[in-house]
Amino acid sequence: MNAENIKKITEDIVSQLGFYLVGFNFRGHGKNQVVEVFIDGKNYINADDCAIVSRHLNEKYRAMFSPDDSYRLDVSSPGIDRPLKFIEQFPKHLNKKFEISYSYNNEIRKTNAELINVNNDELSFLTRDGKELIIKFKDIIKAKVLISFS
């Protein structure tokens, strides 16, 4: 089975169910194939969400894989340490601190700041010195939520 075909079908199903495919890995062959799927959504992902996606993917995969092949499907949330890929992922992280890399006037800048607003294609952050930083989503290279233990 072709990894690109599986990924495309996976993206379609995940999207139809109202989630985003934020990570995909297909490895192995024959009886040792593993499909790892990482999903996210506008709300936090829970075990029920993963089970729903898994059930729909398994229905489709059974028709795609040869009877001589077997596979293991793992569906999970991406985890807090993964960068956000879609602007729709940001609102649920309002008032959280981010590590951000972004493009500004053909240079790459990095900062840590608190997300204070999401408006269409722009994200507003509050910097350490209390200034508002507005970044267009298209200019963000990498944005990760910083884990806080306080």
Name each model feature, range by range:
Residues 1-112, 116-150:
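Short Lys/Arg-rich amphipathic alpha-helical segments
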